[in-house]
Amino acid sequence: MLNRVVLVGRLTKDPELRYTPNGAAVATFTLAVNRTFTNQSGEREADFINCVTWRRQAENVANFLKKGSLAGVDGRLQTRNYENQQGQRVFVTEVQAESVQFLEPKNGGGSGSGGYNEGNSGGGQYFGGGQNDNPFGGNQNNQRRNQGNSFNDDPFANDGKPIDISDDDLPF
């Protein structure tokens, strides 16, 4: 039997982080996931799916994601129930997120307010935070930041100038 859920969507609000009495972190958030089809008026509808993640990942989700952030979730569907204050049985279905992927660069947050954690300076690294997170040495992160956070680091990008290549330089 298989119980596997894979979702890609945007957070509808900031994640809520709390701690159990045993000290385990738990974060809850809701993903808005577009349906693959449109309704009769041609508009795309969305499903709003509650997700839960635990421990270190819960803290990372709370620190780096916010309303509008694009995230990928891999987990399993779980149902639970409890009795509310009126004595009624309430059933809850949610995704237990085993893995949460941040699908946008830190400074490209979906809500337009500038990123996951503005104080974090790890260029392109979600959990780094240090000035030199590159395990191979060097300062590529600092060089990239000094270029005005340009996302177009492609040396072959068209900058409007003609390319002068002779036929002798081509390998074919």
Curated annotation (Swiss-Prot):
GO biological process: DNA recombination; DNA repair; DNA replication
Pfam families registered for this protein in UniProt: SSB
Domain of life according to the entry: Bacteria
Free-text comment about domains: The C-terminus is required for interaction with a number of interacting proteins. The C-terminus acts as a hub to recruit proteins to active chromosomal forks.
Residue ranges annotated as motif Important for interaction with partner proteins: 167-172
Compartmental location: Cytoplasm, Nucleoid
Gene name of the record: ssbA
Domain annotation SSB: ranges: 1-104
The keyword Acyltransferase is assigned to this record: no
Gene3D superfamilies given in the database record: Nucleic acid-binding proteins
Function comment: Plays an important role in DNA replication, recombination and repair. Binds to single-stranded (ss)DNA and to an array of partner proteins to recruit them to their sites of action during DNA metabolism. Associates with oriC, this requires DnaA. SsbA binding to ssDNA prevents DnaB and DnaD individually from binding to DNA. Has a 20-fold higher affinity for ssDNA than SsbB; SsbA and DprA activate the homologous DNA strand exchange function of RecA-ATP. Enhances the activity of 3'-5' DNA helicase RecQ.
Protein's UniProt name: Single-stranded DNA-binding protein A
Keyword Transferase: no
Biased composition regions of type Low complexity, renumbered to the chain: 132-149
Subunit (UniProt): Homotetramer. Interacts with proteins involved in DNA metabolism such as PriA, RecQ, RecG, RecS, DnaE, RarA, RecJ, RecO, SbcC, RecD2 (formerly YrrC), XseA and Ung. Interacts with RecQ via its 10 C-terminal residues. Interacts with RecD2.
Residues that span the membrane, as ranges: none
Phylogenetic lineage: Bacteria, Bacillati, Bacillota, Bacilli, Bacillales
Post-translational modification: Phosphorylated by YwqD, which increases ssDNA affinity; dephosphorylated by YwqE.
GO cellular component terms, A-Z: cytoplasm; nucleoid
